[in-house]
A protein has these predicted regions:
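Hydrophobic transmembrane alpha-helical segments in integral membrane proteins
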Residues: 1-25, 138-142
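Membrane-interface helix-loop-helix junctions at boundaries between adjacent transmembrane segments
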Residues: 62-138
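Juxtamembrane inter-helical linkers in multi-pass membrane proteins
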Residues: 160-175
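Short alpha-helical packing/oligomerization segments
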Residues: 201-227
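Juxtamembrane boundary at the C-terminal end of a transmembrane helix
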Residues: 257-273
């Protein structure tokens, strides 16, 4: 008699544990804004670190094909970037948006289904795994740039109105948020570019590999163009501050809207698009 637990069950359980830890981290992050005392910084870092460790184990068991696995990988990249960025801004303000977003992505991944689908030929190929990982990293960095921009505008509004409440006290200075936005964009563009190039190379090298829908190609190219434009206005045109923040938010919003529009034309939880 075998006592081995089916792999799909293990994957879902690990994601549920990560979801619980991310949810707890979200509650601790939002607590000061609803009147509770801020949690110790060591705790606000340890809990998402534990969630990320469990999440890494879960993702390592996945076949990276379909909507659920893609959302899971994106959530993991976002949490890891959240933890890394807290050192740059010297505070936990990034988790104000990143923690709820990562929690929601993991929840959606579980609801969408994490079991391997029928289209798994070549899914463990190194080219394909790198394509998914780098593409998810590029999107997560774009989301991080959006988060930094949103935090910048919130802090800017508080300063302009001369309100020195919780937002002013808990959010980093504007200069650090602007720097985080720039770093995220500049790092995200090459990551996404490599992800797109690996997808093209994979398709050319392995003609019998995974099917790529036209919607995926359209959205991938559109996202790459938008991210490239955001980097161009920051690096070449030297946009900064409020104008750069608005550009990042507009770009991220456009990418989301196009994704939703394409997804509605081709519904189905078994594929990313």
């Amino acid at each position: 008699m075998s006592w081995a637990w089916p792999v799909p069950g293990v994957i879902v359980t690990l994601h549920l544990v990560a979801l619980a830890l991310y949810g707890l981290a979200t509650a601790l992050t939002l607590a000061p804004f609803v009147g509770f005392r801020p949690a110790p910084r060591a705790l606000t870092i340890a809990i998402p670190c534990a969630g990320a460790a469990v999440h890494v184990v879960a993702v390592s068991q996945l076949t990276l094909v379909g909507l659920g696995p893609a959302l899971s990988m994106l959530a993991l990249c976002l949490v890891l970037l959240q933890l890394a960025s807290e050192r740059l801004v010297r505070g936990s303000a990034v988790s104000f948006f990143a923690a709820p977003l990562a929690t929601g992505l993991v929840g959606l991944a579980i609801l969408s289904g994490l079991a391997p689908g029928a289209e798994t030929v070549g899914a463990r190929n190194t080219w394909f795994v790198l394509h998914v990982a780098l593409s998810a990293l590029g999107l997560a960095l774009m989301a991080l740039a959006f988060i930094a921009a949103a935090l910048y505008l919130l802090q800017f509004r508080e300063l302009k109105a001369r309100r020195f409440g919780q937002i002013f006290q808990l959010f980093p200075p504007l200069e650090r948020l602007d720097q985080l936005n720039r770093v995220a964009l500049v790092a995200g563009f090459p990551a996404l570019t490599l992800g797109v190039l690996l997808a093209l190379g994979y398709g050319a090298q392995f003609s019998g590999g995974l099917h790529v829908a036209k919607a995926q190609i359209v959205w991938g190219i559109f996202t790459w163009v938008v991210l490239g434009w955001a980097v161009w206005v920051r690096v070449v045109r030297h946009w900064a501050g409020r104008r750069a923040a608005l550009a990042s938010i507009a770009g991220f919003g456009a990418v989301l809207l196009v994704y939703v529009a394409l997804k509605l034309t081709q519904p189905g939880a078994e594929r990313f698009l």
